[in-house]
Structure formats: structure tokens, C-alpha cells
Amino acid sequence: MDVISCSSNTLKGLYDISGVEVGQHLYWQIGGLQVHAQVLITSWVVIAILLGSAIIAVRNPQTIPTAGQNFFEYVLEFIRDVSKTQIGEEYGPWVPFIGTMFLFIFVSNWSGALLPWKIIQLPHGELAAPTNDINTTVALALLTSVAYFYAGLTKKGLGYFSKYIQPTPILLPINILEDFTKPLSLSFRLFGNILADELVVVVLVSLVPLVVPIPVMFLGLFTSGIQALIFATLAAAYIGESMEGHH
């Protein structure tokens, strides 16, 4: 009985530890689900910015493009180039996916530096860039995983899984492990960089006058854009790899 009681207490302790969270969070109860309100709010703001900007810029296309139309055409051309370089000639259907990933991450990253999230008071926790939350980056990475599995299966059918035993069946465990590490590396790279950037700026602002952290903030904007490009480029590369069947 003592052994059973000890085991029960140990399991209860592990369960309690698993419920520990970092920081405070605001949750909404929707049906039987508990959703992370902070991430939803900031994500909706980012989506609204993207949709609003696109609608305003291209609602009345001109033969001689306006500044807004010209900007979005340049962004589209840039995303097409990235997709074509990484995926190949069959890049066309994947441009919307790669573009959505790039623009959402780019605007999310910049919103952490440019939008005054902190002045909005919540009952629990505080608002921050969507990509400052591990839930967002993991979701984006899992979407990428689903996309490259779908691309491979659509192109090759069940023959897609033969890649796991190439060039030799001995590499089967390593090839399987690789598919698990891809979303992990994508999500933690993005989350870590954005979180570290925001923490550095917050610490500098609290320690020194406002003028001093400005160069660091500009550097943060640059690295935030680079992180969006890296994520989109790797997503396109994984999709291209799954369609070609080589590593």
C-alpha cells in the first residue's frame, strides 16, 4: 500500500508540474475548449492589417500602378522568385501558401516593435507579437509539415514514403527523425529570435534613456524581416524537397 501511495503521489506531483505555465495568460472559454486569447487578439490584428492594406492598395488596379499597388506587385514578385528558386517549375500552386507564411510572420514580427501592445490592459497577462508565443510558431511549423507531406503524397502517391529507405534502409530511423526535427527547428528558431529581440529592447528601455535603444530597435526590425524570409524559404525548400524526393 505504501508503494502504491508513493507512486500515486509521484504521479500527482508530475501532473501538477505539467500544469505550470510561464507568465500569465488570458483564456477564453469557447464551448468545451480553452483558447489563448492573447494570441488570437494579436493574430486578428495582424490579419486585419494585411487584408486592409491589400484591399486598399489593389481595389482599383491601374495600368500605371499607384505606390501601394506597385509595392504589392513587388512583394508578389519577390515571393514568386523565392518559391520558384526553392520549389522549381511547379512552384505556382504554392505561391499563396509561401506568401501567406512570409507576410503573416513579417507583419507579426514588426508589430512587436512598432505597435504599442503594452498599453492595452488585460485582466491577466499582456499583449505581444503573435510570433512571441510558442503556440503560434509551433502552429506555423506544423502547417508547413502538413504542406510538404501533402506536396509529396500528391506528386508521388504512397511511393513518397520510399524516401525513408534511401539511399539505404539503414538510414530509416534518421530519415524519420529528420521529419520530426524540421517543425521543431522552424518553430523554436522563430520563437527564440523574436522573444530575445523583444526582451533586449524592454531591458534597454528600462535601463537607459529612450534614444539609446533606438539602434537596437532598428536592428530588431531588420532581424525580424530576416527571420520571416528564413521561415518562408525553408518552408518552400521542404516542399520542393518532398516533391523531388532527394535530401
From Swiss-Prot:
Coiled-coil residues: none
Membrane topology field: Multi-pass membrane protein
Domain of life per record: Eukaryota
Compartments it resides in: Plastid, Chloroplast thylakoid membrane
SUPFAM superfamilies, per database record: F1F0 ATP synthase subunit A
Keyword Chloroplast attached: yes
GO molecular function (one): proton-transporting ATP synthase activity, rotational mechanism
Keyword hit for Transmembrane: yes
TM ranges: 38-58, 95-115, 134-154, 199-219, 220-240
Gene3D superfamilies (UniProt xref): ATP synthase, F0 complex, subunit A (1.20.120.220)
Subunit description: F-type ATPases have 2 components, CF(1) - the catalytic core - and CF(0) - the membrane proton channel. CF(1) has five subunits: alpha(3), beta(3), gamma(1), delta(1), epsilon(1). CF(0) has four main subunits: a, b, b' and c.
Function, as annotated: Key component of the proton channel; it plays a direct role in the translocation of protons across the membrane.
Protein name, entry field: ATP synthase subunit a, chloroplastic
Organism expressing this protein natively: Carica papaya (Papaya)
